[in-house]
C-alpha cells in the first residue's frame, strides 16, 4: 500500500525503560482500558531528539534519562476513520513517528506526570515489554510490535550490564 506521506503528522515516541528493563506506560484520561508510551508532535524547526526530550518532560515530568538510540525509520499508523475529524481538525489521517529508546536514570519519585499542570496521563506504571502490545489501543499495536522488535535486544543488553 502506498501511503500519502504528507497526511501523517510528524511525531516522536519514547520507550523509556528502567533498571529492570520495564517500560514506562501511562493511562490517558479519555480511556480506562488502554495504556501508552509517551509520544507527541514535533514543532516546526525542532530536531527530533529535542522533541522527544521535550515530550518526555511534558508527559513524564523527568529529564533524568540517557538517550540510547532512535528507530531506523519512520513508523506510520492510521487513525480509525471516525477519529480523523476529531484529531487535528481532520488535517492528518495518522501519525509518522520516530521512536527513541531512553534509559531512566532516576528514581520513581523523579517522575511527575502532573509536571505541566495539564497532564496527559492519569496514572502510570512500569510494565514488562513483552506485555506492552496487549495494553495498547488497537490502532497502535503494530507500532508497538515494531518498536519492541527493534529495541528489545538493546534493553536486555542494557539491563544485564547495569
Curated annotation (Swiss-Prot):
GO terms for biological process: nucleoside phosphate metabolic process; ribose phosphate metabolic process. Its cofactor is a divalent metal cation. Gene3D superfamilies: Nucleoside Triphosphate Pyrophosphohydrolase. Residues 7-149 form the Nudix hydrolase domain. Keywords: Hydrolase. A motif (Nudix box) lies at residues 40-61. One of its GO terms (molecular function) is guanosine-3',5'-bis(diphosphate) 3'-diphosphatase activity. Transmembrane segments: none annotated. InterPro entries: Nudix_hydrolase, NUDIX_hydrolase-like_dom_sf, NUDIX_hydrolase_CS, NUDIX_hydrolase_dom, RppH. Its EC number is 3.6.1.-. Accelerates the degradation of transcripts by removing pyrophosphate from the 5'-end of triphosphorylated RNA, leading to a more labile monophosphorylated state that can stimulate subsequent ribonuclease cleavage. Belongs to the Nudix hydrolase family. RppH subfamily. This is RNA pyrophosphohydrolase. It comes from Wolbachia pipientis wMel.
